[in-house]
Amino acid sequence: MGAINQGISLFDESQTVINPINTNHLGFFFSFPSHSTLSSSSSSSSSSPSSLVSPFLGHNSLNSFLHNNPSSFISHPQDSINLMTNLPETLISSLSSSKQRDDHDGFLNLDHHRLTGSISSQRPLSNPWAWSCQAGYGSSQKNNHGSEIDVDDNDDEVGDGGGINDDDNGRHHHHDTPSRHDKHNTASLGVVSSLKMKKLKTRRKVREPRFCFKTLSEVDVLDDGYRWRKYGQKVVKNTQHPRSYYRCTQDKCRVKKRVERLADDPRMVITTYEGRHLHSPSNHLDDDSLSTSHLHPPLSNFFW
């Protein structure tokens, strides 16, 4: 009974010592007398004179330890004494385990950040030309092999064909894109061709005025004072007489005429003029030339 009372009083002393409410002390010291008569094992374990058990333990660590193990001090005093003897090792192991867990979490977070950073750096861009197009000037990008890739600021028209594609082996295939000079040339050619087509259409639409004359004559070509050159002939339906086409022989004169016979009355000659003459008739020129030739005979006559 004396040993049990001594153990209970010892438990009371230790409980007063490790009271977590007392915050005036920076640390807690636990000492056990060497003449304890609880048991032979306890006397052998406490044979050394009063030794320090837990020097300068933190207040938060001790509170957490007492909060996690409250029932051991109430129900089993002997177990609480053994627990008090092993208190430094338990606290140190708990602190080391919490520190290792924090370090492990830190390493995991660091590895996660490194992994996400490497994945984001290795992930290919869906549209590598978008930044250069918005910035308005050319830039250069490096691929995984270290070679530079020049980016043109007019690649917005590449669409599906432009850009860099990665295959399964990680090699880059560069698609040929038209340069700015080629695009400018094609655009200029397109503009020129469209202008030419417009001019041709306007020429086709504009027609010279036509004048038609009907005369009774046995000769197809009538003498109208101008010189003509025949350039075509066409067979007309329902008549045996073909249609003839003539052009004025004067330089820069675009007047044409068409001569044909009337289908109902072949004696009638229909002459159609297209355009107007900008010069005097050729007969007057011939008359002038003849008059000058009579007044001034050619030089060849003097050599005979």
UniProtKB/Swiss-Prot annotation:
Record feature DNA-binding region, as residue ranges: 217-282
Chain spans, region Disordered: 141-190
GO molecular function: DNA-binding transcription factor activity; RNA polymerase II cis-regulatory region sequence-specific DNA binding
Gene, per the UniProt record: WRKY13
Family, similarity comment: Belongs to the WRKY group II-c family.
GO cellular component: nucleus
Keywords noted in UniProt: DNA-binding, Nucleus, Transcription, Transcription regulation
Localization terms from the record: Nucleus
Protein name: Probable WRKY transcription factor 13
Gene3D superfamilies found in the cross-reference section: WRKY domain
